[in-house]
Amino acid sequence: MLLSGEKAGLRRREPCVMMGINQEGVGAMLDYICWDWNGTLLDDVPLCVAVMDGMLQRRGLPSLGGEARYREIFTFPVQEYYRAAGFDFGREPFEKLALEYIEEYDRKALDCPLHAGAAEVLEALEAQGLRQLIVSASKQKALEEQVGHAGVRGFFEALLGLEDSFARSKSGLALQYFSAHAVDARRVLFIGDTLHDWEVAQEAGCACVLLAQGHQSRRRLEAAGVPVLESVAQVPAFLGAQKGGRA
């Protein structure tokens, strides 16, 4: 689906001359950057930890123990994360817990900032001719509201979110968009912050770079065997190095 942006129409661009890396490490021309949202562009890990700790505290359960442990146990499907956090689905069903979580998260999500340098990175990549979109496990309405509030909606050709609150999978979103808009997945780089983002990239057939600033630790991300950067601010330099190394 193609959603209207804040800018008065998105420019049609010629294919970008920047080089990327596909799953085999072979240079490929990039047309698109496909971004994850939560943890990749939006700095929401502190909020996620605070909301979950509040839920645990209300039930007399131990806290998560900080962001470092959170990054070690957060996973998809999120049911497994809730179990690791200490919830017993025999006492409360996952759906009830997930709705409680998302209601509190949504009330506070607009207070979350973008990661340092994220807006500047989006602007720089747009200036280089790359088309950008977001594929997220967030609900569609919440995604649109958060991206708009952050002031970066105009950088994206599309925002692709899920239709429920349970964040089961987003694997089909990229494939559907690529098919509907004749996007060559070999010319797409997916940038995310979880192993699920890597799985989505694999299924879609595009390259992947992961960021260690988000919802999973560098140790876990490195198991994917793709480049892991410390932060979104490093993306332009990384892409520039790929271009220079394959020119």
Spans of model-derived segments:
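Short, acidic loop-to-helix structural element flanking the phosphoryl-transfer center
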Residues: 107-134, 140-144, 171
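Glycine-rich phosphate-binding loop signature in dinucleotide/nucleotide-binding domains
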Residues: 128-130, 180-185, 242
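Non-catalytic pre-domain segments flanking phosphatase-related domains
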Residues: 6, 12-35, 187, 247
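A short, structured active-site edge motif that brings together acidic residues
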Residues: 69-70, 153-168
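Acidic, Mg2+-coordinating phosphoryl-transfer loop and its flanking beta/alpha structural elements
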Residues: 189-227
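Conserved Lys-Pro-Asp/Glu-containing loop-to-beta segment of HAD-superfamily phosphomonoesterases
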Residues: 170-199
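N-terminal helical cap/lid subdomain that shapes the substrate entry/recognition surface
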Residues: 30-120
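Conserved H-loop
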Residues: 62, 152-157, 184, 229
